[in-house]
Amino acid sequence: MVELTEIKDDVVQLDEPQFSRNQAIVEEKASATNNDVVDDEDDSDSDFEDEFDENETLLDRIVALKDIVPPGKRQTISNFFGFTSSFVRNAFTKSGNLAWTLTTTALLLGVPLSLSILAEQQLIEMEKTFDLQSDANNILAQGEKDAAATAN
């Protein structure tokens, strides 16, 4: 969208003197060449401004690229990304299933196994404690026999 605004000079222009016919033609040619240079600059600016859309999104720009890439190349790129995304999706699905299987197996087999190992260790500790108590009782019993024998 182009907006036109009028710019007024701050300088007050005085009445221009009358020129002769030749001077007027020379002035017109000079101003025409100056205007052409200015018009060329304005044209290049206006071309850019005409093509620029402030409301254009990234998606609009990507869709516009469709015209640049040939259909055969687009199909090749689409197939490649389709295959890659399918491969990655399947890999994550399979790895997730494997992780779930291993975790469930570890819980179903590992927890009871660890509990039975812990119970076995407690049983071994209790046997050691009973053996130490019986050895202590035997030593005390032998000491009492020796004390009773010396007393008689």
UniProtKB/Swiss-Prot annotation:
* Keywords associated with the record: Membrane, Mitochondrion, Mitochondrion outer membrane, Phosphoprotein, Protein transport, Receptor, Translocation, Transmembrane, Transmembrane helix, Transport
Where in or outside the cell? Mitochondrion outer membrane
Spell out the Acidic residues composition-biased ranges. Answer: 37-49
A single GO CC term for this protein reads: mitochondrial outer membrane
Entries under Pfam families matching the protein: Tom22
Q: What InterPro entries does this protein's entry cite?
A: Tom22, Tom22_fungi
Ranges per topology, Mitochondrial intermembrane: 120-152
- Spell out the residue ranges making up region: Disordered: 27-49
* Major location (coarse): mitochondrion
Membrane topology term: Single-pass type II membrane protein
Q: Which residues carry this modification: Phosphoserine?
A: S44, S46
Superkingdom classification of source: Eukaryota
Tell me which parts of the chain lie in the Cytoplasmic compartment. Answer: 2-97
Q: Where are the transmembrane segments?
A: 98-119
Q: Which CDD domains match?
A: TOM22
Single Gene Ontology BP annotation: protein insertion into mitochondrial outer membrane
Q: Which family does it belong to?
A: Belongs to the Tom22 family.
- Additional detail: Present with 6610 molecules/cell in log phase SD medium.
What task does this protein carry out? Central component of the TOM (translocase of outer membrane) receptor complex responsible for the recognition and translocation of cytosolically synthesized mitochondrial preproteins. Together with TOM20 and TOM70 functions as the transit peptide receptor at the surface of the mitochondrion outer membrane and facilitates the movement of preproteins into the TOM40 translocation pore. Docks TOM20 and TOM70 for interaction with the general TOM40 import pore (GIP) complex. May regulate the TOM machinery organization, stability and channel gating.
Complex formation:
Forms part of the preprotein translocase complex of the outer mitochondrial membrane (TOM complex) which consists of at least 7 different proteins (TOM5, TOM6, TOM7, TOM20, TOM22, TOM40 and TOM70). Interacts with TOM20 and TOM70. Interacts with FCJ1.
User: What is recorded about the domains?
Assistant: Its cytoplasmic domain associates with the cytoplasmic domains of TOM20 and TOM70. Its intermembrane space domain provides a trans binding site for presequences and the single membrane anchor is required for a stable interaction between the GIP complex proteins.
Q: What is this protein called?
A: Mitochondrial import receptor subunit TOM22
Say which species the protein is native to: Saccharomyces cerevisiae (strain ATCC 204508 / S288c)
Q: Which gene encodes it?
A: TOM22
